Amino acid sequence: MKKLKPILLLCMFLAFIGTSCKKSSTNPTSAVSMSLKFNGTAKTSNTVAADYIKSTGTLQVIGKFGNEGLSLMITDIKVGTFAVGDIVIATYSTTADFQNTYLGSTGTVVISSFNSSTVTGTFSFAGTTVDGRNGTVTEGKFSAKVITQ
């Protein structure tokens, strides 16, 4: 019985090691990121979300830069170039309470790739706040995981 105990412990240890090891994924995950310049100041973020509402074909991409944030809402989403103001609503807020939000009036959003799991693209637009201040978003790009509703 004394010889059986070490063998049993060794078997339990090997079983534990064999089941606790996890294989690394062979599929690399896409990076989630957004970068842009607002009025010439560079901003980058890894806090990005993309919500796809399948029934309406609408995609909303949101990026957070501390207390600031950007939102792109695109209707009838597909790979292609879209004009801000037509089927794209683009906003940039410089405060967490959205009191200083620039609503895009001109610009473009280019969707480079879009599928059930990821979306990537570029964007630029000019916008105005409700009190008439102007702002520009340039050199925008994003990569996000898609959540389908």
Where in the sequence are the language-model features?
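Repeat-unit-sized solenoid/scaffold elements
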Residues: 20-29, 67-74, 143-149
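Surface-exposed helix/loop patches within compact recognition domains
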Residues: 32-37, 41-118, 126-130
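Long amphipathic alpha-helical coiled-coil/heptad-repeat bundle
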Residues: 11-14
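C-terminal or internal capping secondary-structure element at the end of a domain, subdomain, or sheet
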Residues: 112-149
